[in-house]
Amino acid sequence: PVKNFFFGNVKAHCDRIGKICDATKFSMKDVRIESCDTVMRIDNCDYASFFGFSNVTTGSSVKIEKTGGECRYLNVQTYPLVPVNYQSIRPGEVWLDTEGKPIQAHGFQVTFREGKYYWYGEDKTHTLFGTNRMFGGVRCYSSTDFYNWKDEGRIIEPATDPHSPLHHCQKLERPHILYCAKTGRYVCWLKSQSNDGHFVILEAEHFMGPYHFVRNLKPNGFAVGDFDMYADPDTGKGYVWFERPHWEQICAELSDDYTNVNG
């Protein structure tokens, strides 16, 4: 049987994609069908997962049928793919951007600047668990009312160089961006879980990037876990609080340019 088979970003003019039979694990993501009745039939699959299936002509969801053998796990998530305009926050629902796509900003931060909210976080659109494809960059959204969020694109891109600390195989999480008044630059810290825990530090002239790698950092030689950051608006001093995993919480003062710590 087929194992760990994945389709992504499929565009097709068809009545159906076909039938999947005897697959150990089968996933399809972000599928845009323009004309469809029954799109998919699945038979005797241990695990089948379908994310973002939609008919782009009508904005409606598409039809998936189970036939024959048992499917032990079936997960289907469909989205309208039409513009949305929220009047409130809807707990328990998948939050969509203004184009009708699921918001991809995990492990996020929200900041307010120049009359807009900016929500940025990990882009998991193409993350495939069970593979080495983990880091999809950092995506940013903007809003004036905190309900409706416009996709501004990725402000940090995953690297294609396998030796880069930003390569898609790296386990990078929880981006934090501070503005450093002394340098006039934006500094981004990410937590890396690859190998031992450390920070990956980037810098940019503009909040929306492009960001450039500065250094990897283990403050005072400590491995790092979850963290938070703060810049004091009165003194201009920056601080990082981080977990020494399963051991203790540590606070360190940042260097003047926010790209290191002062002991």
Task: Explain the meaning of each model-derived region.
Residues 79-263:
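Carbohydrate-active catalytic/glycan-binding domains of CAZyme proteins
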Residues 10-15, 34-37, 56-61, 76-81:
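Surface-exposed loop/turn segments connecting beta-strands in extracellular beta-rich domains
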